[in-house]
Amino acid sequence: MHRWSQAISLGIAIAGIVAALWPRSYSRDLTGDEDPYRLFMGRRLIHFPIFWIGAALLAYVVLQATNPAWRYTQSATQWWLVRMDHIPWLPCGIDAPFTQSNEWRQVIVYTAAWLSVCSVWVGLTRRRSLRILLGIIVGNALLLVGLLAIQQFTGNHRIPWPLTAWTDYPLTASFIYHNHAGAYLALATFCAIALAVWFFDHGSRSFAKSTPASVLALAALLLVGFVFFTLSRGAILTLAVSTAILAGWFLLRWRVLPGIPGANPVIRMAIVAMFIVFVAVVFRYLDFSEIWGRWDMIATQGSREVSVHSRVLVRDAAIDMLKTQGLRGVGAGGFRYLFPEYVQNYPEIYEGGTLYWEHAHCDWLEFPIELGLAGDLLILGGAGWWIAFFVRRRAFWNALAVPLLLGCLQTVIHAGFDFPFQCPAILVTWCMIVAIAGRWIELEPSATERTEG
């Protein structure tokens, strides 16, 4: 990933946390009969466990960077690793170029995600603000869909400039790797679905004449359609499974919770009609041959299909690497440098045409390999806190939080056979969505409480 984009992401995250922590003054016009007061959000931040877990993870990665066990060395034609003296009982890393990948580059990415989560948690105090933030994510995804549509219609994947000036690879929307484009659009799809479900639910309860639910549902359908054109088979499969689970949850919720009316038949028919028109236009003007070709290879060759077989072997080599390096880790961002030592035991990997593997194509393996046992425990601790939070808050039937969490779960499943979390855009967005779901649960009563009240 490009350094400039990571620097911009970090700058936005820093600006966000500064704005979130800025003291807020409430005058008598806003407080009613109460005295004016100032609100300091730093107190809320220091009581947020994810703040401390994230800080510990960043400190851990910095410790890896300051205790390198290998040094990256390069000549005019090749590169290799040289062993270095280091403290053997501490986490270690690789002294590698910042321009390629090393612990300091990962500190930038992780800090952006950490600060973004903290900004959402302490800075957004109204549900409307959370909905606006989700709307921004959906709007950004729709802009990417528009760019992808232009690329499909023109057959030119070397747009837009200036992104093409910084890479020699064809682009899928603005992503270098088409699977990352698919994973990002699939994640944004569930943001659109979550907003549509909430507006439908809220409008039904308040007897509103109209809501944005229909527009958001069409946006979700549009995003689903263009996930296919990213040619990401992993994103398509996980999106299909997660959507089926969501449909089952929605039907069960409709039966379990009283007072949730069905959709207006006129609106339902309008959505169906617009969807039919959308499908007709897509099939009329877009070329599906590449999509069918990729799925036909899977259907006819199965696990012996070249890309699938190569990834299976890469997974086997990564498992070998995890067994020998998983205790202390090789350093955040260091997988690509040490992995060739293990690839040489699986020469069939090179039959796929890829001679250098930067990632394990399985985040479930790559993160433990890079971060080691201590880093894994920090991540699992953060995940455990979030799970306990949602269970304790009884978020099972929440109209907005559940679709968001299903979208996040979809990305986690996708990470089992690809590397979506190595893309900073996906990692930061995913972390923010989890925080948005958690903050929403805090600000909105559960569906059970509303029906009982």
PLM feature spans:
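Interfacial juxtamembrane loops and adjacent helix segments
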Residues: 69-100, 157-172, 292-316, 320-321, ...
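Hydrophobic transmembrane alpha-helices of multi-pass, membrane-embedded glycosylation machinery
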Residues: 10-18, 189-192, 236-249, 383-386, ...
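Membrane-interface loop-to-helix entry segments
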Residues: 100-112, 174-194, 364, 370-377
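Hydrophobic transmembrane alpha-helices and their immediate junctions
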Residues: 373-403
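Membrane helix-loop boundary segments at the extracytoplasmic
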Residues: 1, 177, 366-371, 402-436
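Transmembrane signal-anchor hairpin modules in multi-pass inner-membrane enzymes, especially those
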Residues: 1-139, 195-218, 244-275, 440-453
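A membrane-periplasm/extracellular boundary helix in multi-pass inner-membrane enzymes
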Residues: 59, 67, 146, 151-155, ...
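Membrane-interface alpha helices of multi-pass inner-membrane proteins
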Residues: 217-231, 410-415
